[in-house]
From Swiss-Prot:
Residues 973-1112 are annotated as: Allosteric domain. InterPro entries: ATP-grasp (IPR011761), CarbamoylP_synth_lsu (IPR006275), CarbamoylP_synth_lsu_oligo (IPR005480), CarbamoylP_synth_lsu_oligo_sf (IPR036897), CbamoylP_synth_lsu-like_ATP-bd (IPR005479), CbamoylP_synth_lsu_CPSase_dom (IPR005483), MGS-like_dom (IPR011607), MGS-like_dom_sf (IPR036914). Its EC number is 6.3.4.16, 6.3.5.5. It comes from Zymomonas mobilis subsp. mobilis (strain ATCC 31821 / ZM4 / CP4). This is Carbamoyl phosphate synthase large chain. The lineage of its organism: Bacteria, Pseudomonadati, Pseudomonadota, Alphaproteobacteria, Sphingomonadales. Keywords: Amino-acid biosynthesis, Arginine biosynthesis, ATP-binding, Ligase, Magnesium, Manganese, Metal-binding, Nucleotide-binding, Pyrimidine biosynthesis, Repeat. ATP 1 binds at residues 129, 169, 175-176, 208, 210, 215, 241-243, 287, 301.
Length: 1112
């Protein structure tokens, strides 16, 4: 049936900030939905609090609301905009829960707004654990034995029926939030208590343990005429018990029999029919567990929306699930929608793939001290990489090197080389992020495959493939690299990188009696070894490979296994040789002038969605300027890896080897103008020198200038030459040197390794003993690089600047004043544009210094500078001549496409000929960071120079305090209007908090404080009650927080011991949860914001209307 004409305007709810379990896959799906609806002529109203998304670009929807995603705020937007329909399936669990609340409280009915895509009944039936189980019983599908509870007492009653171990799954949550596996009663009580708090309906499912069973997912699309197709089957290599988001997965499923597949296919379709009885659900995901012992199949859950797996399935097959689901929601049927990849088939054709896709999650346990790197049913990964190959070994090894965590393939686990079998078995029994590598190492150490399968519950088929890789490794170790082309190609077809082959050849040389230093040295010995092994460095292996005329060919993702020609150039590399003839490359590079943009790879803390945003905008700008845009990336969650973001897409790992092969292919036709490495974060920057060495131009700021800014010694010399202030600093290459430099500078100091992103291993050090403790971890992170030591400017105000330069002119795009003090990582600090309290003279000085630095570094494109302001002095902290994570926020606040302007400048255009960049006028935007503390119980939620946030939100309003309040609400840190606040601040903060705190008591808010703070406030006439510190006896402050008696916490500390003493307070507020502030500056702003929200109602306004105020 044709699209619905009774609808004119449709609202889409986004997913909000990037959090563990809900990441940028929803920007991908939301962007597709916006484009699909506008293509059909509908007015689109978008609500999302995340400024780093493509979907919140002002030209993506007709009305864009960057507002908190709560039922109350969305209800106000509905009242104002009066949409005819609401599409809730593109924004993850956040959108579903919000839509369900709006249906329940009568808002949708009141304003005659219809839910499309999935109605409230379907959502409730899928998300409510009891209703879902009853629905499965009704259609004859088995679920694990289970009991539903709404209280701890009910849960304990249900445990008698279910038994231990038990899996706890809270209702209406995502990413396994609040859930877990309980092996004893104490763990059960603990997990159930957390699960009841995490569930918005205070409901948990207590389920029989199916740990160790095989886990499968089916991605299904259904239309309102009951046409159903399976887009993709996905198999988890990790067994049940590890959240699917944390599992290594493959597509299509590789170990199912055809009979099992057909049973699961039919069951998936039956689930969709039962859950979405009267509506076209669009895309849904159904998860199954299969007992390998007896074939028992149970349904685990269903997501009645596009999901993380939907994004993976879309990228794996080329089938745009979110776009198709959106079209189904407005009335189309599958046979009426054209497959964009082929241009010749309808969407009702089930995709067929003739390759293997592997997804591997990326974790950030190193960011969180005391976090146990164990995987459970609660998701902990922060990103993922996807790789495509013609076989599982090729796909797996490509994915491993695409993770960017130092692996070049199926690398050995050094700690287990030569280990006792009992040690290896104990490590295999622990579900850790690197357990697959441990399994491979177990094979190397001689453990039987059957034993490995018994301990890990990995399917024997996967262990057999690992054994094949290891057999090939052993061949190289024994005999060196093959000098015959067919044998060498077979190695490459198994996914071996040149670097991994060099490492294996080096082991071969080592076996011949030489150490690594001798093998990698130069001269006669090295030349002899190279002749014997084929090469012992990556460059030598590459030379040998090229001499044998072995290069990858590129195949296209076409959704139909080459049955129809693919119209969209979406490609992956393979070394697989055909049975007859030579490998055929389907890349077919064009004869146009072209620019290659390198993406950021898998999301991680410090490098996430913001950089993908910049890469996408580079594509948009350069395409508009007449260039063919070529994107290289390996992240399945992102908009940059959508088939229609760039002209050509290579889904490949971001390593020197893989990128150089792509560039070699593209140079065969047309003109390769250059490569952009500025926009993808640290990942592409690391490749700049290798690309430049290959004779390919780097567009924008030169790699030498980037190195100058990162190299502390060279940079300090430049700063001195320009006459700018910098905190006293020094460089140390040993422990003794670090102690000497610290003594010279004076404590406190800020210490960091060089060449990092996200402040990895940065720390504020207050004394020699803490420095001694730190040095060991810092040196590991630094590798060959020195340790950098800076004077720490305590209580200074940090300022971020984003600027664009073209070699002649410099434009300051935004000056962002941080709310937290200097020393807290800029990515973790709240900030305001325009600055909320900086004097005009300081702003002018910052502009002047920005101009000097841009010219001195010969910046062409984007530049980010961090300053610290103390008194009337401006200190330079660091300069990054590249895109920063604040660029999307600045662009949303300003209304100008900063990244697009920068991309055009990098391609040679001048700023004077491009859209003007100016600051917000008449309103303020505040960015706030979002943290994953709840995912890592036991971790101290303290802010530091090391970045820990996973995402961000934006609050925007005509005045600063209300913008800050909105940002807090959007971040899940809603400021209370009443209640009891706890205050405990260091001596240097006491004077400045008196007035703001007194204003709160005037509004009827009650205060409690520790002894020193209480006595000081009382002396200033502020009514306050004293409460015990934790070490002063009970009841103490943590007891009050746990009892729900505290509504907000302000706790500032000075020195290492004070920080340690207050750790229990910070941990308890995360569990409560209670808003808390650990700096006086943030506490003062929060107090002003509470006064503001008590004085006036929260107003909603579209981004377009704010921008029209500014540009009027």
């Amino acid at each position: 049936m044709p699209k619905r004409t009774d609808l004119q305007s449709i609202m889409i709810i986004g997913a909000g900030p990037i959090v563990i379990g809900q990441a940028c896959e929803f920007d991908y799906s939301g962007t597709q939905a916006c484009k699909a609806l506008r293509e059909e002529g509908y007015r689109v109203i978008l609500v999302n609090s995340n400024p780093a998304t493509i979907m919140t670009d002002p030209d993506m929807a007709d009305a864009t609301y960057i507002e908190p995603i709560t039922p109350e705020v969305v209800a106000r937007i509905i009242e104002k905009e009066r949409p005819d329909a609401l599409l809730p399936t593109m924004g993850g669990q956040t959108a579903l829960n919000t839509a369900l609340a709006l249906a329940s409280d009568g808002t949708l009915e009141k304003f005659n707004c219809e839910m499309i895509g999935a109605d409230a009944t379907a959502i409730d039936k899928a998300e409510d654990r009891l209703k879902f189980r009853q629905a499965m019983d009704k259609i004859g599908l088995e679920s694990p034995r289970s009991s539903v509870a709404h209280s701890l007492e009910e849960a304990l009653d249900g445990l008698d029926y279910v038994g231990l171990p038990a899996i706890i799954r809270p209702s209406f949550t995502m990413g396994g939030t609040g859930g877990g596996v309980a092996y004893n009663k104490e763990e059960f009580i603990d997990i159930v208590s957390g699960g009841l708090s995490a569930s918005p309906t205070q409901e948990v499912l207590i389920e029989e343990s199916v740990i160790g069973w095989k886990e499968y997912e089916m991605e299904v699309v259904r239309d309102r005429h009951d046409n159903c197709i399976i887009i993709c089957s996905i198999e988890n290599i990790d067994p049940m018990g590890v959240h699917t988001g944390d599992s290594i997965t493959v597509a299509p499923a590789l170990t199912m029999t055809d009979k099992e597949y057909q049973i699961m296919r039919n069951a998936s379709i039956a689930v969709l029919r039962e859950i979405g009885v009267e509506t076209g659900n669009g895309g849904s995901n159904v998860q199954f567990a299969l007992n390998p012992e007896n074939g028992r199949l149970v349904v685990i859950e269903m997501n009645p929306r596009v999901s993380r797996s939907s994004a993976l399935a879309s990228k794996a097959t080329g089938f745009p699930i979110a776009k198709v689901a959106t079209k189904l929601a407005i009335g189309y049927t599958l046979d009426e929608i054209t497959n964009d990849i082929t241009g010749a088939t309808p969407a009702s054709f089930e995709p067929t793939i003739d390759y293997v896709v592997t997804k591997i999650p990326r974790f950030a346990f190193e960011k969180f001290k005391n976090a146990k790197p164990l995987l459970t049913t609660a998701m902990k990964s922060v990103g993922e990489v996807m790789a495509i190959g013609r076989s599982f070994p090729e796909s797996l090894q490509k994915a491993l090197r695409g993770l960017e965590n130092g692996l070049s393939g199926l690398d050995p686990v050094e700690a287990l080389v030569g280990a006792n079998p009992s040690v290896i078995e104990a490590e295999l029994a622990r579900p850790t992020p690197d357990r697959l590598l441990v399994a491979a190492q177990a094979l190397r150490e001689g453990l039987p495959a059957e034993k490995i399968c018994e301990i890990t519950h990995y399917d024997p088929w996967f262990i057999a493939r690992l054994a094949e890789i290891i057999a090939a490794e052993n061949e190289v170790i024994s005999n060196g690299l093959p000098l015959e082309a067919a044998a060498f190609r077979r190695l490459k077809a198994m996914g071996f990188s040149d670097k991994r082959l060099a490492d294996l050849a080096l082991q071969s040389a080592h076996l011949r009696g030489l150490g690594k230093a001798q093998a990698k040295g130069s001269g006669i010995v090295h030349d002899a070894l190279q002749a014997m092994t084929g090469g012992v460095t990556e460059a030598e292996v590459r030379t040998l490979r090229h001499s044998l005329n072995i290069r990858p060919v590129f195949k296209r993702i076409d959704s139909c296994a080459a049955e129809f020609e693919a119209k969209t150039p979406y490609m992956y590399s393979t070394y697989e040789a055909p049975f007859f003839g030579e490998p055929v490359c389907d890349s077919l590079p064009s004869n146009r002038k072209k620019v290659v943009i390198l993406g950021g790879g898998p999301n991680r803390i410090g490098q996430g969605l913001e950089f993908d945003y910049c890469c996408c905008h580079a594509c948009f700008a350069l395409e508009a300027a007449g260039y063919e845009t070529i994107m290289v990336n390996c992240n399945p969650e992102t908009v940059s890896t959508d088939y229609d973001t760039s002209d050509r897409l290579y889904f490949e790992p971001l390593t020197g080897e893989d990128v150089l092969e792509i560039l070699h292919t593209e140079q065969k036709n047309g003109t390769l103008v250059g490569v952009i490495v500025q926009f993808g974060g640290q990942t592409p920057l690391k490749l700049a020198a290798e690309i430049e060495k290959a004779g390919i131009p780097i567009l924008g700021t030169s790699p030498d200038a980037i190195d100058l800014a990162e190299d502390r010694e060279r940079f300090s010399a430049l700063v001195s030459e320009l006459g700018l202030l910098q905190p006293a600093n020094g460089i140390a290459r040993s422990r003794d040197e670090a102690i000497s430099v610290a003594d010279k500078i004076g404590y406190p100091i800020l210490i960091r390794p060089s060449y990092v992103l996200g402040g990895r291993a940065m720390e504020i050090i207050d004394g020699p003993s803490q420095l001694d403790d730190y040095i060991h971890t810092a040196v590991k992170v630094s590798g060959e690089s020195p340790v950098l030591i800076d004077q720490y400017l305590r209580d200074a105000t940090e300022v971020d600047v984003d600027a664009v330069a073209d070699g002649d002119d410099v434009v300051v795009a935004g000056i962002l004043q941080h709310i937290e003090e200097a020393g807290i990582h800029s990515g973790d600090s709240a900030c305001s544009i325009p600055p909320y309290s900086l004097p005009a003279s300081i702003i002018e000085e910052i502009k002047s210094q920005t101009d000097k630095l841009a010219r001195a570094l010969k910046v062409q494109g984007l530049m980010n500078i961090q300053f610290a302001v103390k008194g009337d002095k401006v200190y330079l902290i660091e300069v990054n001549p590249r895109a920063s994570r604040t660029v999307p926020f600045v662009a949303k606040a300003d209304g100008r496409p900063v990244a697009q302007v920068a991309a055009r400048v990098m391609a040679g255009e001048k700023l004077r000929n491009l859209p003007e960049i100016s600051w917000p006028e008449g309103y303020t935007a505040v960015k706030e960071a979002v943290f994953p503390w709840a995912r890592f119980p036991g971790v101290d939620p303290v802010l530091s120079p090391e970045m820990k946030s996973t995402g961000e939100v934006m609050g925007i309003d005509i005045d600063f305090p209300m913008a800050f309040a909105k940002a807090q609400l959007a971040a899940g840190n809603a400021l209370p209007r009443a209640g009891t606040f706890f205050i405990s601040v260091k001596d240097s903060d006491k004077a400045q908090i008196v007035e703001p705190i007194k204003a709160l008591t005037d509004l009827g808010i009650k205060l409690v404080a520790t002894d020193g703070t209480a006595r000081y406030l009382q002396s200033k006439g502020v009514p306050v009650e004293r409460v015990n510190k934790v070490r002063e006896g009970r009841p103490h402050i943590v007891d009050l927080i746990k009892d729900g008696a505290i509504s907000l916490v302000v706790n500032t500390t000075e020195g290492w011991q004070s920080l340690q003493d207050s750790a229990s307070i910070r941990s308890s507020v995360v569990l409560a949860p209670v808003p808390y502030f650990t700096t006086a500056a943030a506490a003062i702003v929060a107090a002003e914001a509470i006064v503001a929200i008590k004085a006036r109602e929260l107003e909603v306004r579209s981004l377009q209307s704010y921008h029209s105020m500014k540009h009027a």
